[in-house]
């Protein structure tokens, strides 16, 4: 096989002419398409970087908000516990005061009843003494004077 230099030279010239024609008619369009594609890729990368930064900021904000919410929840829980403890103590103290008041009223009532019973007993003793005296003496004596004597006697005895 023999090499034909003329044919090679003609092919090279044809190729150069083809490239010049393609460059003249299509190079600007191809360059614009490549540049547009490169610009779109750069914008996509820039947008992805911006979105990543925005996501990072949002994550940090969310973590800060979550931490703040947890702290606020803890404080609120502590305040509610303190309030519940205060109310519990207040209820217990009120119950103690009310129980003491009931006991005091009961003691006063018991003392009144005791005084009433003593008075009634004293009256019955006086009545019985007057009856016995009348029966023993066989006559009626001045009842008011007799009651006064019996009351003095009962006072001295301590009934």
UniProtKB/Swiss-Prot annotation:
TM region positions: 8-28
Functional description taken from the UniProt entry: F(1)F(0) ATP synthase produces ATP from ADP in the presence of a proton or sodium gradient. F-type ATPases consist of two structural domains, F(1) containing the extramembraneous catalytic core and F(0) containing the membrane proton channel, linked together by a central stalk and a peripheral stalk. During catalysis, ATP synthesis in the catalytic domain of F(1) is coupled via a rotary mechanism of the central stalk subunits to proton translocation.
Similarity comment: Belongs to the ATPase B chain family.
Source organism: Clostridium perfringens (strain 13 / Type A)
Subunit text: F-type ATPases have 2 components, F(1) - the catalytic core - and F(0) - the membrane proton channel. F(1) has five subunits: alpha(3), beta(3), gamma(1), delta(1), epsilon(1). F(0) has three main subunits: a(1), b(2) and c(10-14). The alpha and beta chains form an alternating ring which encloses part of the gamma chain. F(1) is attached to F(0) by a central stalk formed by the gamma and epsilon chains, while a peripheral stalk is formed by the delta and b chains.
UniProt GO molecular function: proton-transporting ATP synthase activity, rotational mechanism; proton-transporting ATPase activity, rotational mechanism
Record's GO cellular component terms: plasma membrane; proton-transporting ATP synthase complex
Membrane topology, record value: Single-pass membrane protein
Protein's UniProt name: ATP synthase subunit b
Alphabetically ordered keywords of this record: ATP synthesis, Cell membrane, CF(0), Hydrogen ion transport, Ion transport, Membrane, Transmembrane, Transmembrane helix, Transport
Pfam family, one: ATP-synt_B
SUPFAM superfamilies assigned: F1F0 ATP synthase subunit B, membrane domain
Subcellular location: Cell membrane
């Amino acid at each position: 096989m023999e090499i034909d230099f003329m044919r090679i030279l003609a092919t090279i010239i044809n190729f150069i002419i083809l490239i010049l024609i393609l460059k003249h008619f299509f190079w600007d369009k191809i360059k614009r398409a490549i540049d547009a594609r490169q610009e779109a890729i750069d914008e996509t990368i820039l947008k992805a970087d911006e979105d990543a930064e925005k996501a990072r900021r949002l994550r940090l904000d969310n973590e800060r908000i979550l931490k703040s919410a947890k702290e606020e929840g803890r404080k609120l829980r502590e305040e509610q516990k303190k309030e519940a403890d205060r109310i519990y103590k207040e209820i217990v103290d009120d119950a103690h005061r009310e129980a003491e008041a009931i006991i005091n009223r009961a003691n006063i009532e018991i003392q009144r009843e005791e005084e009433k019973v003593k008075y009634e007993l004293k009256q019955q003793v006086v009545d019985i003494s007057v009856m016995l005296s009348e029966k023993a003496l066989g006559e009626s004596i001045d009842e008011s004077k007799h009651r006064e004597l019996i009351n003095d006697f009962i006072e001295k005895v301590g009934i």
